């Protein structure tokens, strides 16, 4: 039986009894559920979709670069807050605790690199750019302990929690914790669209406004390309853009990513979930929808305050049905990128691919730990010796999924500057100082351990056993 608005009073009284939630969380949750039940999902009329112009999605190279003047740079940085989304766990990569504490390169974690980058800016320009981490209840305790190690760094680190909402038991439409599910599994963080109300409710937003801050740069903590960019910041301040989403050209790997469209005179995010079935292939085409959302967002702090106070941020709801411990539950989420249509003078900026370097799997770790990149001052920079603008495609079998097993299977990370693609399956082990070039496939037969020897140079080969080396 589908839930209707008639289920709302029962749900509301159950939520009132949940002492683990703050009043603002209760009202936020009820508001989200009532919007969902009233079916106010915004339907996209396909014929009204237009490709955004260069005024709406500005090419990065058309923006005026910032001068080398130290005073101008300091003035810009004094208006900035950097916020990293830190709610995710490293479970998919076989790690416990926050994903941001996975070691990326040279013994440094995502969080280490972020702190080093901001500290370098603060030291160089004599400014005080703060770092804010939005945690979830899954990462809050661990993060508090972890940030203690940065006490002596020249970065003010703030943390706050995003909202904690109860999962809803699908068939009865009641909060799971009300039925006795009191452990963490009964709850969920409602997506990063929650960043705006959560920042406001934490009191941090008012603190930053009182310090003269104007913009927050929001990014995923696992995107190594999401570094402070003064050219973008200067453009937004000069043009009074309340919101800016960084987009970048799609490749075949990104066909499911959200894109920016012009719709009824406003810029809007279009996600694959909103696309009618008959248009999904068109949505995935690189010809019509050429860009996708990197989730690097720049947002004016006063505008966030105004919109949150007016309860105006009614982003598209993403229903996320799950089965947990044999119970079918529903969690309702929103995405920060979908907020773009509520801000005045919102734009996209079409940035180089280098600003999108996410580490979602061990195959991404292989890229960033290899000679394809170098690490300088906390910045991961691409090796100029690589002539191909796109990265090699890398597919590693389940034996490499967890970070610890991935690392144990490489004596050292191979050279991949001249690699086009790598596909590895089965019980494969790599020696040290190996060079991979062109298209390489390594597939160990079932039950067979296949070792690639030290200093092997493998170019355009299919390897199924030692005899193929």
From Swiss-Prot:
Xref: SUPFAM superfamilies:
Nucleotide-diphospho-sugar transferases
The record's induction entry says: By sucrose.
Main localization, broad class: cytoplasm
User: Which major enzyme category is it?
Assistant: transferase
Give the GO biological process terms.
callose deposition in cell wall; cellular response to phosphate starvation; pollen development; sucrose metabolic process; UDP-alpha-D-glucose metabolic process
Q: In which tissues is it expressed?
A: Expressed in cauline leaves, flowers and siliques.
Q: Which UniProt keywords apply?
A: Acetylation, Cytoplasm, Nucleotidyltransferase, Transferase
- CDD domains annotated for this entry? UGPase_euk
Q: Where does UTP bind?
A: 85-88, 99, 162, 191, 222, 360
Pfam families (alphabetical): UDPGP
Q: What terms describe the molecular function in GO for this protein?
A: UTP:glucose-1-phosphate uridylyltransferase activity
Describe the disruption phenotype. Reduced number of seeds. The double mutants upg1 and ugp2 display severe growth defects and male sterility due to the absence of callose deposition around microspores.
The record's EC number reads 2.7.7.9
Chain positions found as N-acetylalanine: 2
Q: Which InterPro entries match?
A: Nucleotide-diphossugar_trans (IPR029044), UDPGP_fam (IPR002618), UDPGP_trans (IPR016267)
The UniProt annotation places substrate binding at 87-88, 192, 220-222
Q: List the disulfide bonds.
A: none
User: GO cellular-component terms in the record?
Assistant: cytosol; plasma membrane; pollen tube
Signal peptide per UniProt:
none
Explain the purpose of this protein: Converts glucose 1-phosphate to UDP-glucose, which is the major glycosyl donor for polysaccharides. Acts redundantly with UGP1 and is essential for the synthesis of sucrose, starch and cell wall, and callose deposition.
In terms of PANTHER family, this protein maps to:
PTHR43511
Q: Which family does this protein fall into? A: Belongs to the UDPGP type 1 family.
Protein's name in the database: UTP--glucose-1-phosphate uridylyltransferase 2
């Amino acid at each position: 039986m589908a839930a209707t608005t008639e289920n709302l009073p029962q749900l509301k009284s159950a939520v009132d009894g949940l002492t683990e939630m703050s009043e603002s969380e209760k009202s936020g949750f009820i508001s989200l559920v009532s919007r969902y039940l009233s079916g106010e999902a915004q339907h996209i009329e396909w014929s009204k979709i237009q490709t955004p112009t260069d005024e709406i999605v500005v090419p990065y190279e058309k923006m005026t670069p910032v001068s080398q003047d130290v005073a101008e740079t300091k003035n810009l940085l004094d208006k900035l807050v950097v916020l990293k989304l830190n709610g995710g766990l490293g479970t998919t990569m076989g790690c416990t605790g926050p994903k941001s504490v996975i070691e990326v390169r040279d013994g440094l974690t995502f969080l280490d690199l972020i702190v080093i980058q901001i500290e370098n800016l603060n030291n160089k320009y004599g400014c005080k750019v703060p770092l804010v981490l939005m945690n979830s209840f899954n990462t809050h305790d661990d993060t508090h302990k972890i940030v203690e190690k940065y006490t002596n760094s020249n970065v003010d680190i703030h943390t706050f929690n995003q909202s904690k909402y109860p999962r809803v038991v699908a068939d009865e439409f009641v909060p799971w914790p009300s039925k006795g599910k009191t452990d963490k599994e009964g709850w969920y963080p409602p997506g990063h669209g929650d960043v705006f109300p959560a920042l406001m409710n934490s009191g941090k937003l008012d603190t930053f406004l009182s310090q003269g801050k104007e913009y927050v740069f929001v990014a995923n903590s696992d995107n190594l390309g999401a570094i402070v960019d003064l050219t973008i910041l200067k453009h937004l301040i000069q043009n009074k853009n309340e919101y800016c989403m960084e987009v970048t050209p799609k490749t075949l790997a990104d066909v499911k990513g959200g894109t920016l469209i012009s719709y009824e005179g406003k810029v809007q995010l279009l996600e694959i979930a909103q696309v009618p079935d008959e248009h999904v292939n068109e949505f995935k085409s690189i010809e019509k929808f050429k860009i996708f959302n990197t989730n690097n967002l720049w947002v004016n702090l006063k505008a966030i305050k105004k919109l949150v106070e007016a309860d105006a941020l009614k982003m598209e709801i993403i229903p996320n049905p799950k089965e947990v411990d044999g119970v079918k539950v529903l969690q309702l989420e929103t995405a920060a990128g979908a907020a773009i249509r509520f801000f005045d003078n919102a734009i996209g900026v079409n940035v180089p691919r280098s600003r999108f370097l996410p580490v979602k799997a061990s195959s991404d770790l292989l890229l960033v730990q290899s000679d394809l990149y170098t690490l300088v001052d906390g910045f991961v920079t691409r090796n100029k010796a690589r002539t191909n603008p796109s990265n090699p495609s890398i597919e590693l079998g389940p034996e490499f999924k967890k970070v610890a097993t991935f690392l144990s299977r490489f004596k050292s990370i191979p050279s991949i500057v001249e690699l086009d693609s790598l596909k590895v399956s089965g019980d494969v082990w790599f020696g040290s100082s190996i060079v991979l070039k062109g298209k390489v496939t390594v597939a160990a037969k079932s039950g067979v351990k296949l070792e690639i020897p030290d200093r092997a140079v493998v170019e355009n080969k299919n390897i199924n056993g030692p005899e193929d080396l």
